[in-house]
């Protein structure tokens, strides 16, 4: 229905792209895998990868389609919300945001702030990092509300901040990172949506402002399609779908999705824009991998440095202990009436160095 079928093979696609110098230059700079993604899109084998920032933000653009992001966030939060504004990342306190492949911050109608983030390298996004992102959202809101209310500021004017993180892959076989293992703990089972907030072990009920919603998209792919036929299943299915065959099945189940896939297929008529989006996504992935590898290397260096320092400390401890033993031996030999010369000979046998033996006798005799 929405598959273009304009091109019969790769040569046909590349001939078409070559008519657009900007798109052609970008396309020729791609690695083979990314060229294949572009080719598959134009050949109607694959849809656009919506989990990448440029594609997600285009399809969920709040100026053009104000309802889509509202519906997605509503489905995740389990309550109806309305997105009223998309915020910029320019005033964020966190400058190391490059490990995300998609990041969008919005304000809801009630004043609360939500960030929707998609992470491809799950190991690079541990709980500590999520905590910092949430704190950044809260402080951003605090500054805005305080500046607006000035002398009338009251903490009760602050609204919730929701941190939504969608992990593309949480396969525990690929890494022993805590975030992977957490998603696949036995007690978790096949659950793919996890909601967390601050609670007290005594049952004390206080409502804090920071909520977390974590989604494992790979777990959803395994079990989600068979779950209840609800709004959340529909939107996550959209994000998880890669082929037009699956897209057609989705549209049979959710007819309202046909508009989205029609829009996706229309980009085939604008190669400069679609190849540009692929280029932007590729750059983000390269930056992600660079920063991830840099972080991994730094962590490895710090670990090795710590091991060296521990070994040095152990060596120093051993040296101190051996000095104490030599001192005790020398004192005992003195009591026994042993001569310096014989003591030097005895110690030289132990430490295999006559010079060292002489220094020890000089020090402790």
What is each of the regions a protein language model found here?
Residues 1-211:
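Accessory alpha/beta interaction modules
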Residues 193-235, 239-240:
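Extended serine/threonine-enriched, polar tracts that run as long, contiguous segments within proteins
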Residues 64, 68, 125, 230, ...:
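Charged, alpha-helix-enriched surfaces in structured cytosolic catalytic cores
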